[in-house]
Regions:
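Bacterial N-terminal signal peptides that target proteins for export
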Residues: 1-11
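C-terminal segment of classical bacterial N-terminal signal peptides
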Residues: 16-23
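Alpha-helical segment of the N-proximal tetratricopeptide repeat
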Residues: 27-53
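Hydrophobic face of amphipathic alpha-helices that form TPR/SEL1-like repeat modules
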Residues: 29-33, 59-68, 97-104, 122, ...
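Short helix-capping/linker turns of helical repeat alpha-solenoids
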Residues: 39, 52-57, 68-70, 75, ...
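Terminal, low-structured helical/coil segments at or just beyond the last alpha-helical repeat
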Residues: 132-176
Length: 176
């Protein structure tokens, strides 16, 4: 009887968690649908509604609006902050974008070291079926590797190895 009493609340908690994730996914998809139709303000609003729930896809969508100046004034610093939010929440394409931004200094201070780390982490976390995306990451990773000193490369490889064990980025990567 006691097991049933524990399982019931746990089951309800799981159901609640799954239902909120479905709402978040639906809001992102709603925003994406608007985005594809060129309804950028509506897309941004849907993503802003979803963002407090911690959805990485919505943070990426908001970043895109700032990066391209869609429904908001173009602001590469704000775009980089939103891409970083998506990256820290686990969105592989957010990780790739912040890596590219560090490579070119777009909205951030240029850093081949941070670019290399973020691009490498993006590759590690990219879906296996995203072959073109993963191949492009490898090209960019190799470009950044050539820009690093031996000491920077060694430090970067340690960060990547640590990430593989903990799935957490060091503090220095949590800020722009």
């Amino acid at each position: 009887m006691m097991a049933r009493a524990i399982i019931k609340p746990a089951g309800l908690a799981l159901l609640l968690l799954l239902s909120t994730q479905q709402v978040a996914k639906a809001q992102f998809l709603d925003g994406f649908g608007h985005f594809q139709k060129g309804e950028f303000c509506e897309a941004r609003e849907a993503w802003l509604d979803d963002e407090p729930d911690g959805d990485s896809s919505s943070a990426f969508g908001i970043a895109e609006t700032y990066s391209r100046g869609l429904c908001v004034k173009e602001d590469q610093i704000k775009a980089s902050r939103w891409y970083l939010t998506a990256a820290l929440r686990g969105f592989s394409r957010g990780r790739a974008e912040i890596g590219i931004r560090y490579a070119y200094g777009k909205g951030v201070e240029p850093s081949a070291y941070k670019s290399y780390v973020w691009l490498s982490i993006a590759r590690l976390t990219a879906a296996k079926w995203e072959t073109d995306y993963r191949e492009n990451l490898v090209v960019n990773i190799n470009l950044m590797r050539r820009a690093l000193t031996a000491a920077e490369l060694s430090k970067a490889e340690k960060v990547i190895a640590q990430y593989r064990q903990t799935y957490r980025m060091p503090r220095e990567f949590e800020i722009l």
